[in-house]
Amino acid sequence: MLTNQELTAKVKEISLTYFKQSFDHEAKWNQRLRTTGGRFFPKDLHLDFNPKMAELKDFEGVILHELTHYHLYRSKRGYKHRDADFKRLLSQVGGLRYAPSVIDKKIKYYYSCQNCGQLYPRQRKIDTKKYRCGKCRGKLILKTSGN
């Protein structure tokens, strides 16, 4: 994994390549990030990144996403996810709109519908008397348990 200095250098390089503007602040790893790819801090303009994202091939897209926040904020334009400026610039540079999932879900139970055969992978057990198939309203049965 890259050090914080190497990460900052990579972010600066990507900023010049895609935005033709310099990144003049710090980029660092944040171990506490679980589901997000990164965070932009308007208060001091630094970027935090999830270290689990570093191994993904889409990591450059996560960096582009955070740099989009950074450059729009510095140019006093809409830098939030809902703003048209953000959506437009993000699509122009090819950044990711959403962070890829790094959480590996442990599927323990597989339910299937008796009527249509629709399969429902689940992490937790469900009450088959209470829940039905969302497709045809058929009865659900437990196929296999991963225990």
Swiss-Prot record:
One of its GO terms (molecular function) is zinc ion binding. It is found in: Cytoplasm. Its cofactor is Zn(2+). Keywords: Cytoplasm, Metal-binding, Zinc. One of its GO terms (cellular component) is cytoplasm. The active site is at E66. Zn(2+) binds at H65, H69. Binds 1 zinc ion. Belongs to the SprT family. This is Protein SprT-like. The lineage of its organism: Bacteria, Bacillati, Bacillota, Bacilli, Lactobacillales.
